[in-house]
Curated annotation (Swiss-Prot):
Binding site for Ca(2+) 1: 82, 84, 86, 88, 93
InterPro entries for this protein: EF-hand-dom_pair (IPR011992), EF_Hand_1_Ca_BS (IPR018247), EF_hand_dom (IPR002048)
Motif (Prevents secretion from ER): 313-316
Protein name: Calumenin-B
Source organism, top-level taxon: Eukaryota
GO cellular component: endoplasmic reticulum membrane; extracellular region; Golgi apparatus; melanosome; sarcoplasmic reticulum lumen
Gene this protein is translated from: calub
Key words of the record: Calcium, Endoplasmic reticulum, Glycoprotein, Golgi apparatus, Membrane, Metal-binding, Repeat, Sarcoplasmic reticulum, Secreted, Signal
Amino acid sequence: MELRPLVMCFALCVVYASSKPTIEKKDRVHHDDPLSSRDHEDAENFDYDHEAFLGQDEAKTFDQLTPEESKERLGMLVERIDEDKDGYVSVEEMKKWIKHSQKRWIYDDVDRQWKGHDHNGDGLVSWEEYKNATYGYILDDPDPEDGFSYRQMISRDERRFKMSDLDADLKANKEEFTAFLHPEEYDHMKDIVVLETMEDIDKNGDGFIDLEEYIGDMYNQEGDPSEPEWVRTEREQFTEFRDTNKDGRMDKEETKDWILPSDYDHAEAEAKHLVYESDNDKDGKLTKAEIVEKYDLFVGSQATDFGEALARHDEF
């Protein structure tokens, strides 16, 4: 499939979209999604814990297993969670596993894109492979009349690729490629997320985001003389909270505080909860036996699912 028509279509869509008033608010803030849509009510059931520990889809799979099958598969998971292979699962290892389970869609996306970029099959995606697969012959035939600078886009991608390339060999392994495609998920990539956001919003090129640039990124008032209430609220937010040093503009640190807030760490809280509830000898870490013994806290099975079905039936 040729890339040029796709890229041109994208460019035209963006130009068309930018010419229409934007009523709905654009949100650049990166928030962690909740671990589960269920209420965390362990006195009634462990549905929240199951979805937090496994992810929603995998939790449903466990609900169809017998208790014996559920325990066996849980035991296999424990061996993966115990990264340092010391025979224990620490709070930190549990936290990392929960985060991994919650972000499984990201890894699925990376796997899908990986197949289209690792052309030589060496298990790495080089910068050249990515650039050629993404931009193709646009490199040789840029069209400046469409208002887009593809060379500028390539330069921006290359900068992000190099930031994700921790060993600086211009070849990305799976983890580095994940950081490149989803930089907001990695601490060492957060500065590039901030920089790219500022470049998008900073129209006068002074390296800051002023009030009008901030509002202009969220709302296009063309053809609409009156501002929605949320726009007036955002003006107040900028003045009272975003611009912390009160100089009328946001610098890099203020922008970072805005788009990458320090949210409550749900994964860490759940990891501590699971360890506390299962830690029989209270040494602050879990053995495989301790986890499997409390298997119904971590995973479901036909037995727990049937029990909850009976409980729901009794309510009626």
